[in-house]
Amino acid sequence: MAEATATSPAAEGAAHKNVWTTLITNCDYLPGLLTLDYSLKKVGSRYPLVALYTDSFPPEGHAALQARNIPAKHIPYLLPAAHKDYSNDTRFYDCWSKLAPFSLVEYDRVVQLDSDMLVFRNMDELMELELDSSALKGEGSRVFAASHATPSNCALTTQHADPASAQTQGAPATAGLGVLNGGLQVVNPSTAIYEKILAVLQTPSATSNYAFADQSLLSDLFPGLWVPLPYVYNALKTLRWEGVHSEIWRDEEVKNVHYILSPKPWDEKGGEEGQGDETHRWWWKVNNERLEEEKKRGII
C-alpha cells in the first residue's frame, strides 16, 4: 500500500476522492510534470495532480514539488519476477510502476497520466466515466479505460473514414491488435485487481512476452474488457503527422497531447525550442507561461 509523505501538501490529494496521478522516478521528466500540473490548473480542473514517486526520486525533485504545492505519494518500484530485457528502450523498466494506481484504494477514481503530456482542454469528465465497480474484482467488461496503441495495424486506422466520430468515440477495444496505450488510464482502484496484476508479474511465462511492459500486461489480462477512449484524451504527437493518423486529428478537438519519443520538448536547447514539431511549440508556449508566473511568485 502506498504511503502519503510530507514532501508536499499530501492533505490536498487526500481530501479528494478523485485525482490525477503521474509517475516520477527521476528528474529527467520533472519539467514535463511541472508543466503538466500547470496545464491542468490552467484549464480549470477541479482535481489535483498527485506525483507518484519511487525511492530513486531525488531531494531536488521533492523540493520542486514542494515549492509548487504539488501533492506527492510514495509507491513501490514494480518489476516482474523474471528480468525482462528492455536495453533497447530502457524507459519500459519504469513503466511497470504505472500499474500502481490500481492499488490506491484510498481514492475512488484515479486517472493516470504520463508526465510527458500537456492538457489543452478540461477533461474532468473522465472522473465520471462509467466503469465497473471495484466490487466486481476485475470480472466485468469495463475494468478500466484507455486509448489504443498505434502499431501499423492500429485500431485508429478503422476510424479514418469517419473522423468526426473519432473525436468522441474510441475504436472498439478489440480493433486492430487490441492493445492499449498506457499513457492515460482511467482506474477505479481495487485490491483484487491489483492482486491479479501482481500475480502476473510473478509469472515469467507471461511477462517474457510483454514487449510493452504495463500496457502489454493489461491488454493480456483484460482482453477486450476495457473501455476505449477517443484519441483526443491521449493524442500522441505522431498522430498529427502526415501519413500516420492526420486524417482524424483535429487541433481544436484535442484535449491532451502526449509527447512520445525523443527528444522531449524540454530537451530542446540553444534556440531550437519548438522548431522540430508544431506540437512542441505548443508545449513551450505553456511552459514559458508557467515560468513567468512562477517568477512572479518567487519560485526559481
Model feature map: region roles:
Residues 1-300:
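Glycosyltransferase catalytic domains, chiefly GT-A lineage
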